[in-house]
UniProtKB/Swiss-Prot annotation:
Pfam families: ZapD. Belongs to the ZapD family. It is found in: Cytoplasm. The keyword Coiled coil does not apply. One of its GO terms (biological process) is FtsZ-dependent cytokinesis. It comes from Aliivibrio fischeri (strain ATCC 700601 / ES114) (Vibrio fischeri). The gene is zapD. Keywords: Cell cycle, Cell division, Cytoplasm, Septation. Its main location: cytoplasm. InterPro entries: ZapD, ZapD_C, ZapD_sf. This is Cell division protein ZapD. Interacts with FtsZ. Cell division factor that enhances FtsZ-ring assembly. Directly interacts with FtsZ and promotes bundling of FtsZ protofilaments, with a reduction in FtsZ GTPase activity. One of its GO terms (cellular component) is cell division site.
Length: 248
C-alpha cells in the first residue's frame, strides 16, 4: 500500500494509563542501555533510571497497578463460564496475573532501595545540571566509568533487578490491555474524527508514513477526538486520512 510502512501511535485515556506508558518507555530505555555498549549509553541509563525514581516517588504505582491487576483477574475469571472460551489459555493468563500480582505486592515500594543507594543518590542530585556530568561535577561517576565493563554492567543489571516485579506486572497489564481490541480500518474525514466508547484505557493507531501526518488526540474513557496535522506545515490536515484504530 505504501513504500515507507506504518507508524504507530498510542494515546492514554486516563492519567493512570498515561503513567504506565511513561514507565514502560523508561523500562525500554533502561533495557536498551544497560549493557553500556556505546560510549554515552550511561547517560541514557541514568537519566531513565532517575526519571523512573521521580515518578515512583510521586505516584503510588504499586497500589494502582495492584488494583488494576485484580480487576483484570476478575474479568478473566468471569469468562470461565462462557461456552467456547479456550479454558487452558484462560487458566494460563489467570496464573500469570496471580503470579505477577503476588510478586508485586510482596515487594517494598518500588524504587525505595535504589533511592537509598549512596552512589545513585549522590549522582541524581547533580545529574540533570546542564553539562553537569563532567569529572569535576561528578568525580564518583568519573571513577565508575573507568571500572571494568563487566563491573558496570553488573551494577546496571542489579539496579534494574530491583524493579523487576514492577516491570513484569506492568508489562502484563499493558499486554493484556492492548490485546482487548483489534485494529479496524477508519477514515478521518477532512483529517478529523471523534467517537464515543465505554470505559476505554488506550487508543492505538496505525498510520501510513507516506501520508505525512501525525495525530493530535484528546479524550477520556468514554469519548475521544483526533485531528491529523501535516508534518510539513504543522497545520490541520484537510484531506481524508485512512488509518487503523484499536480502542482498548
Amino acid at each position: 500500500m505504501n513504500g515507507l510502512g506504518m507508524q504507530k501511535f498510542e494515546h492514554p485515556l486516563n492519567e493512570r494509563t498515561r503513567i504506565y506508558l511513561r514507565i514502560e518507555s523508561l523500562f525500554r530505555k533502561l533495557g536498551h542501555s544497560a549493557d553500556l555498549t556505546q560510549p554515552f549509553e550511561y547517560q541514557v541509563f541514568f537519566s531513565s533510571l532517575f526519571n523512573m525514581l521521580d515518578i515512583l516517588e510521586q505516584v503510588q504505582v504499586k497500589a494502582e497497578l495492584g488494583k488494576d491487576l485484580e480487576k483484570l483477574r476478575l474479568q478473566y475469571r468471569a469468562w470461565m463460564d462462557i461456552e467456547g472460551v479456550d479454558q487452558s489459555a484462560l487458566l494460563s493468563v489467570l496464573e500469570q496475573i496471580s503470579q505477577v500480582h503476588q510478586n508485586l505486592m510482596q515487594t517494598t515500594r518500588p524504587g525505595h532501595s535504589l533511592k537509598e543507594d549512596r552512589f545513585l543518590s549522590a549522582l541524581k542530585q547533580r545529574f540533570f545540571i546542564p553539562g553537569g556530568d563532567c569529572c569535576f561535577d561528578l568525580p564518583a561517576l568519573h571513577h565508575w566509568l573507568h571500572l571494568p565493563l563487566e563491573v558496570r554492567c553488573r551494577n546496571t543489571h542489579n539496579w534494574m533487578a530491583q524493579l523487576l516485579s514492577l516491570s513484569d506486572a506492568l508489562s502484563l497489564w499493558l499486554r493484556l490491555t492492548r490485546e482487548t481490541a483489534r485494529f479496524e480500518p477508519q477514515i478521518a474525514r477532512n483529517g478529523f474524527m471523534q467517537s464515543e466508547m465505554e470505559n476505554a484505557n488506550l487508543l492505538r493507531l496505525e498510520i501510513p508514513i507516506d501520508q505525512g501526518v501525525y495525530p493530535m488526540i484528546s479524550g477520556h474513557k468514554s469519548r475521544f477526538a483526533l485531528r491529523f496535522m501535516s508534518f510539513e506545515t504543522n497545520k490541520n490536515c484537510e484531506k481524508d486520512i485512512e488509518f487503523t484504530l484499536a480502542v482498548c
